[in-house]
From Swiss-Prot:
Its main location: mitochondrion. The chain crosses the membrane at residues 7-27, 44-64, 77-97, 109-129, 153-173, 180-200, 226-246, 263-283, 302-322, 338-358. Pfam families: NADHdh (PF00146). GO terms for cellular component: mitochondrial inner membrane; respiratory chain complex I. PANTHER family: NADH DEHYDROGENASE SUBUNIT 1, NADH-UBIQUINONE OXIDOREDUCTASE CHAIN 1. It is found in: Mitochondrion inner membrane. This is NADH-ubiquinone oxidoreductase chain 1. Its EC number is 7.1.1.2. The lineage of its organism: Eukaryota, Fungi, Dikarya, Ascomycota, Pezizomycotina. The keyword Transmembrane helix applies. One of its GO terms (biological process) is aerobic respiration. Core subunit of the mitochondrial membrane respiratory chain NADH dehydrogenase (Complex I) that is believed to belong to the minimal assembly required for catalysis. Complex I functions in the transfer of electrons from NADH to the respiratory chain. The immediate electron acceptor for the enzyme is believed to be ubiquinone. The keyword Transmembrane applies.
Length: 371
């Protein structure tokens, strides 16, 4: 019994982890193809059909590269930093609801778990930059730590407003609360602020000051190459995919698009009425078909839910890519000033304003029990 439960748990993790890593691989291809199209270039088109296998060719190239060990670096922490960053980047997928019951671990404090995991990834960046014994890497890690800590305040404050509407830290409850209306409509300013904070939290352009090529060569990743660089690469794009999924859950309804239960009820009705005029020799065939339909209905439902949340997340990823191709990199002082003097005052004002608006609905005339 113990071994069967262990195998099932491992399969559940692999069912989430493998598609997530494949999504990370194809996000890189989509980014290069999109930027090439905007800049009137061809982009990757030689490896596989339309360049779809370019990510695997790049991964093979990095894995086969020779790594030159640094004599002045703390090699234990130097290797440990990228691994820590990748682990905490992947741990966030454990609480993502891909359907009403399609989640590895349904945690009541799932939102707090996501914020904690994203915060701990900063330690890996700091360790990697400090242990390299390089000025460029160390400055890049300090920039990244200050940027991540600053914009985590923006993200957590924006999420707080969503929690005020739902009354729960559970991501599944937040998704189900949007069956009537998506939160992106009443909370549009908060959605915009959260999206800007997500770009800064994932070190993407125009907020990629931690790895500014013109100033810091490659930031905290300057001395990392070959296999070690792959960990940082997967962690960065894994965080992008995770933040886009979180955005789609909090504001775009996650896996909600149409009520799939109503669709399957209609299919059940159609199926049951197809056999009104059946004859006796078809009874056994019908029972077999009915069992097959009932068993695989849940699989089809989960597959559809996964496609819905994947489509919404892909739209957010595409907006990330458009931001990188459209906007120039800002200065570091502008980045920090924008957080502390613009975004935080606005979000704090909204934290006061939104509860007042919600409370005002309870004292409107049509809510007063006068008769």
């Amino acid at each position: 019994m113990f071994y069967s439960l262990t195998i099932i748990s491992i399969l559940e993790v692999l069912l989430v982890l493998v598609p997530s890593l494949l999504a990370v691989a194809y996000v890189t291809v989509a980014e290069r193809k999109t930027m090439a199209s905007m800049q009137r270039r061809l982009g990757p088109n030689a490896v596989g059909y339309l360049g779809l296998l370019q990510a695997f060719a790049d991964a093979l190239k990095l894995l086969l590269k020779e790594y030159v060990a640094l004599t002045q670096a703390n090699m234990t922490l130097f290797f440990l930093g990228p691994v820590i960053t990748l682990i905490f980047s992947l741990l966030g997928y454990a609480v993502i609801p891909y359907g009403p019951s399609l989640v590895i671990q349904d945690v009541n404090l799932g939102i707090l778990y996501m914020l904690a995991v994203s915060s701990l990834a900063t330690y890996g960046i700091l360790l990697a930059g400090w242990s390299a014994n390089s000025k460029y890497a160390f400055l890049g890690s300090l920039r990244s730590a200050a940027q991540l800590i600053s914009y985590e305040l923006v993200l957590s404050s924006a999420i707080l407003l969503v929690i005020m509407l739902t009354g729960s830290f559970n991501l599944g409850v937040n998704t189900e609360s949007q069956r009537a209306v998506l939160f992106v409509l009443p909370l549009l300013p908060i959605f915009i602020i959260f999206f800007i904070g997500s770009i800064a939290e994932t070190n993407r352009a125009p907020f990629d000051l931690a790895e500014a090529e013109s100033e810091l060569v490659s930031g905290f990743m300057t001395e990392h190459a070959a296999v070690v660089f792959v960990f940082f690469f997967l962690a960065e794009y894994g965080s992008i995919v995770l933040m886009c999924i979180l955005t789609s859950i909090l504001f775009l309804g996650g896996y909600l698009f149409i009520n799939l239960k109503d669709v399957f009820n209609i299919l059940d009705f159609v199926y049951s009425n197809l056999f009104i005029f059946e004859i006796n020799w078809m009874v056994s065939e019908r029972s077999y078909t009915e069992d097959f339909f009932n068993n695989y209905k849940s699989i089809l439902e989960g597959w559809l839910y996964g496609w819905i949340i994947g489509l919404k997340s892909s739209i957010m990823i595409f907006i990330f890519i458009l931001g990188r191709a459209s906007f120039p990199r800002i200065r570091y002082d502008q980045l920090m000033g924008f957080c502390w003097t613009v975004l935080l005052p606005i979000i704090f004002a909204l934290i006061i304003l939104v509860p007042c608006i919600l409370e005002s609905f309870y004292i409107l005339p049509w809510n007063l029990n006068l008769f």
